[in-house]
């Protein structure tokens, strides 16, 4: 290696390359790590040095060299690369490795317009000094490389044009805590700031992208998911599309309920005109969704919902596929098909499903969600009424078309609307759930808007976060984490701005939260349980019982302090009904775990004091924030021991947690013999979760005789999910073999559904 190379320093001066200095930094970064070779990293980076190279380029070359060595056999390179990257990041942000004092940092950032000036109005210099003592900057050293790159790319406050970075991770965590608890009484708030900071900076609570990147800055829109319902009028259709544009521009993921729109050929104004049907309006929504690209990368994302019995359903089911022409396809949204028991019954009995335009059958559309018996009565009545336009299709043909499209696109989702309303925190007679969101984990009431400022409409918002199951040692720890998550997210509802009155009204009235989990696969591996063989059923029952119990308890305590949410009377909780009362009883055949908590005392306390939040739980996908916590994604099994994610900084490799000790305990996705075990677990979770779950189905065609997944199997899994009370099904993944080519480096699916970090966390 040529010792005479000149390097250009950050201040522009030049000096001879100092290989000792590089060696010392590597020595420091490798301390306590196993099976990492400093000389390997040096060798790989030296060949890329050249005369006049900038010191910052040297640093980046070394980081890259370490990152390229991350593998199943040497997972600790992900920490070596991360420490080097943190060193580099702090140099860029502060000009030195040691971070400045918190107060000085905040003053500087407020002056630059990067932080919200209320921070300095709300807290004294003395309080900032106290917060500084809470911070442990060494926690930066616990990040994996993928986490540091995600922080740099998405979360740290920066100038996205020049790439300058202004903060490091511990400041992010403490300031999110400070912002969220700023309205708490002075005598208690710092204690909450400390507790919340400790929980998020040790990865016990995982926060969604909008909160991590936005809280502490002057922009205040952090709801991950937005649900907008459209009425059957031009005014409502236009109001819906302008609401979509407003929220897409703020990085939210959108769920659109377009199920009320009348079918092709319906009369308008008593027959004066002939209706063009759903497809032109779906196109209008697609244009709205794609109108604002986030940083020029891509447009927003939406899932659009309609009922299975809609007269146009056969044309709607194929909207996403690659056949057809531009005129009869709307490919850039995903779709959710809404089903209930009557539809499944017709399938099982080999009968027909009758299709109607919602505009021709008074009361049917509303009853589909609000009252299953009334729906069946009206449906059979309208089937017999010859004066009503209708079309009969064999149930098996309609279900097969739907499942074929789900299999070929992966993005036709399922919503069981009866489960969403019978096992729901809302009273379906007053506040029915008529749609879900982008990623199918939210189930909240909505009302159509007639114009964008309509006070009577309701746009549903949900604010998310998650518990990292891998970071807790016993279920009692969830009590404190539930208190912190509920209080922080509830405070966020008052802290954020609302671009549309109908959204503010719903958020303030219902105060809905969706707290989920990440790292479930690691949690199972740690306990020696598997997805597919039933061994995890009772553990899952115990775990999710604890989660929902402690969340309800935390919200009930908060209600004693700050009052119940204003629309508490629209919930089933107000009647003393709990999730343990309304779950699908078929679950008792697969989980015989008794209840472990005092639900009766909680029931009485909720009846007396109410809840601060109408909903508390939802299980969302968590691709990005799982990387920050070095965790597995949501409730999903990993696809490989090493996952690869492409990012603008190149390829990020991430090894499953504790691989060295647990590699035999993990059950990988494509090792599972089928969907049964997974769907049972989702059903058990859904017994307790008050909203819904982003649950996926997965198929490996090579497991079947002809190398094709039989339709019978797809329908059987759909019915299994329904039987166990599953409310929604999200992606359908099909193994295509290509992704296994790189030995053990199985690339994670590149998914553009929620790239905004919207209703994922």
Swiss-Prot record:
Disulfide bridges in this chain: 225-462
Effect noted on mutating residue 441 to D: Decrease in activity
Site (Interacts with thioredoxin/glutaredoxin): 754, 759
One GO biological process term: 2'-deoxyribonucleotide biosynthetic process
Active site: 437, 439, 441
Residues that bear N6-acetyllysine: 283
Post-translational modification remark: Binding of the substrate occurs primarily when the active-site cysteines are reduced.
Binding site for dTTP: 232-234, 262, 269
GO molecular function, one term: ribonucleoside-diphosphate reductase activity, thioredoxin disulfide as acceptor
Record note on what altering residue 441 to A/Q does: Loss of activity
Site (Important for electron transfer): residue numbering on this chain: 730-731
Signals that turn on the gene: Induced 5-fold by hydroxyurea (at protein level).
Domain ATP-cone, chain residue ranges per copy: 5-95
Keywords: Acetylation, Allosteric enzyme, ATP-binding, Deoxyribonucleotide synthesis, Disulfide bond, Nucleotide-binding, Oxidoreductase
The keyword Transmembrane helix belongs to this UniProt entry's keyword annotation: no
Enzyme Commission number, as recorded: 1.17.4.1
Positions of ATP binding: 9, 15-21, 55, 91
Family stated for the protein in its record: Belongs to the ribonucleoside diphosphate reductase large chain family.
Record NCBIfam families: NrdE_NrdA (TIGR02506), PRK09103.1 (NF006578)
Function statement: Provides the precursors necessary for DNA synthesis. Catalyzes the biosynthesis of deoxyribonucleotides from the corresponding ribonucleotides. R1 contains the binding sites for both substrates and allosteric effectors and carries out the actual reduction of the ribonucleotide. It also provides redox-active cysteines.
Protein name in the entry: Ribonucleoside-diphosphate reductase 1 subunit alpha
Source species: Escherichia coli (strain K12)
């Amino acid at each position: 290696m040529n010792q005479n190379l000149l390097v250009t320093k950050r201040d522009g001066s030049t000096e001879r390359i100092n290989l000792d200095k590089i060696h010392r930094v590597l020595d420091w970064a490798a301390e306590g790590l196993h099976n990492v070779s400093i000389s390997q990293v040096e060798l790989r980076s030296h060949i890329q040095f050249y005369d006049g190279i900038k010191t910052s380029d040297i640093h980046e070359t070394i980081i890259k060299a370490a990152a390229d060595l991350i593998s199943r056999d040497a997972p600790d390179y992900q920490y070596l690369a991360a420490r080097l990257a943190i060193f580099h990041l702090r140099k860029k942000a502060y000009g030195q490795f040691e971070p400045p004092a918190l107060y000085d940092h905040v003053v500087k950032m407020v002056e630059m317009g990067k932080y919200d000036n209320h921070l300095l109005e709300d807290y004294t210099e003395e309080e900032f000094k106290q917060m500084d003592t809470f911070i442990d900057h060494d926690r930066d050293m616990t990040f994996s490389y993928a986490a540091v790159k995600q922080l740099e790319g998405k979360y740290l406050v920066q100038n996205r044009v020049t790439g300058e970075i202004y903060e490091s991770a511990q400041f992010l965590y403490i300031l999110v805590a400070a912002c969220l608890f700023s309205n708490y009484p002075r005598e208690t708030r710092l204690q909450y700031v400390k507790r919340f900071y400790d929980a998020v900076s040790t990865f016990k609570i995982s926060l969604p992208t909008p909160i991590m990147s936005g809280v502490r800055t002057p922009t205040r829109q952090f709801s991950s998911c937005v649900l907008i319902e459209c009425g059957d009028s031009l005014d409502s259709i236009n109001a819906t599309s302008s609401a979509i544009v407003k929220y897409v521009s703020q990085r939210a993921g959108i769920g659109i309920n377009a199920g009320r729109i009348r079918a092709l050929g319906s009369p308008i104004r008593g027959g004066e005109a002939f209706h063009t049907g759903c497809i032109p309006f779906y196109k209008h929504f697609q244009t709205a969704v794609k109108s604002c690209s986030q940083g020029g990368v891509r447009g927003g994302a939406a899932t659009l919902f309609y009922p299975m019995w809609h007269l146009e359903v056969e044309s709607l089911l194929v909207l996403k596929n690659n056949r057809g022409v531009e005129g009869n396809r709307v490919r850039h949204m995903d779709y959710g098909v809404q089903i209930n028991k009557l539809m499944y019954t017709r399938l099982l009995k080999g009968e027909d499903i009758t299709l109607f335009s919602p505009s021709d059958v008074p009361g049917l559309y509303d009853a589909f969600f609000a009252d299953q018996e009334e729906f069946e009565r009206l449906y059979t009545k309208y089937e017999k009424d010859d004066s009503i336009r209708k079309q009969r299709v064999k149930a098996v043909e309609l279900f097969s078309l739907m499942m074929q499209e789900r299999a070929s696109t992966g993005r036709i989702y399922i919503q069981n609307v009866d489960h969403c309303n019978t096992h729901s925190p809302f009273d379906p007679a007053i506040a029915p759930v008529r749609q879900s969101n982008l990623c199918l984990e939210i189930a909240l009431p909505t009302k159509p808007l007639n114009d964008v400022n309509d006070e009577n409409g309701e746009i549903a918002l949900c604010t998310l976060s998650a518990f990292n199951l891998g970071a807790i040692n016993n279920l009692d720890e969830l009590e404190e984490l539930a208190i912190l998550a509920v209080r922080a997210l509830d405070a966020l509802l008052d802290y954020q701005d609302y671009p549309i009155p109908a959204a503010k009204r719903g958020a303030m009235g219902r105060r809905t939260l969706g707290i989920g989990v990440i790292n479930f696969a690691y949690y199972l591996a740690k306990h020696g349980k598997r997805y597919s063989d039933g061994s995890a059923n009772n553990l899952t029952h115990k775990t999710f019982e604890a989660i929902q119990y402690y969340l309800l308890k935390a919200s009930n305590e908060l209600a004693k302090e700050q009052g119940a949410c204003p629309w508490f009377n629209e919930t089933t909780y107000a009647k003393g009904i709990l999730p343990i009362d309304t779950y699908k009883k078929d679950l008792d055949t697969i989980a015989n775990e008794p209840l472990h908590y005092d639900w009766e005392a909680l029931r009485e306390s909720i009846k007396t004091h109410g809840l601060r939040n109408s909903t508390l739980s939802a299980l969302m996908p968590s691709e990005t924030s799982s990387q920050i916590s070095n965790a597995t994604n949501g409730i999903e099994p990993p696809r490989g021991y090493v996952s690869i994610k492409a990012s603008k900084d190149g390829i990020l490799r991430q090894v499953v947690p504790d691989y060295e000790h647990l590699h035999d305990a993990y059950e990988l996705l494509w090792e599972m013999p089928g969907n049964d075990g997974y769907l049972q677990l989702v059903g058990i979770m859904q017994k307790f979760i008050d909203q819904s779950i982003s649950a996926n189905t997965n198929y490996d065609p090579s497991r079947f005789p002809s190398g094709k997944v039989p339709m019978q199997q797809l329908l059987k899994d759909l019915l299994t999910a329904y039987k166990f009370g599953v409310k929604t099904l999200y992606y359908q993944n099909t193994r295509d073999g290509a992704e296994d080519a790189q030995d053990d480096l199985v690339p994670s699916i590149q998914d553009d559904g929620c790239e905004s970090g919207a209703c994922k966390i």
